[in-house]
């Protein structure tokens, strides 16, 4: 049995009216034929530009507001030891207790329970050489 492919183009215009308060956007979906077999889906979406009112152009306060909004506050200081620094492990139940390892990465999210990833030269009984520790479970040592 021979199968023939039909050349089809399907375009779905978005004629949806926007709800009050929602931004209006324009989108279209089209299925284009391909010679290689298979179908292709093309989705395009574009936002309509908001109409500029003449009152916002004339007032200097409105022009100054976007400049003030772009100002960012300074970054907080980094959490934990620096990457590559040597740390001593203070967690008693750890295989590497009182051993020294090097910091691989530190998660900067303050909600993370164990943000410090430490790599050791010696592997444990499960053939693992890295572990995560809390900030109070590591002590930075001079290299």
UniProtKB/Swiss-Prot annotation:
Region annotation Disordered: where it falls in the sequence: 43-85
InterPro entries per UniProt: Elect_transpt_acc-like_dom_sf, PSI_PsaE
Record bears the keyword Cell wall biogenesis/degradation: no
Gene Ontology MF, one: protein domain specific binding
Principal cellular location given in the protein's record: plastid
Annotated GO CC locations: chloroplast; chloroplast envelope; chloroplast thylakoid; chloroplast thylakoid membrane; photosystem I reaction center; plasma membrane; plastoglobule; thylakoid
Modification(s) after translation: 2 isoforms may exist. With or without the N-terminal alanine.
Entry protein name: Photosystem I reaction center subunit IV A, chloroplastic
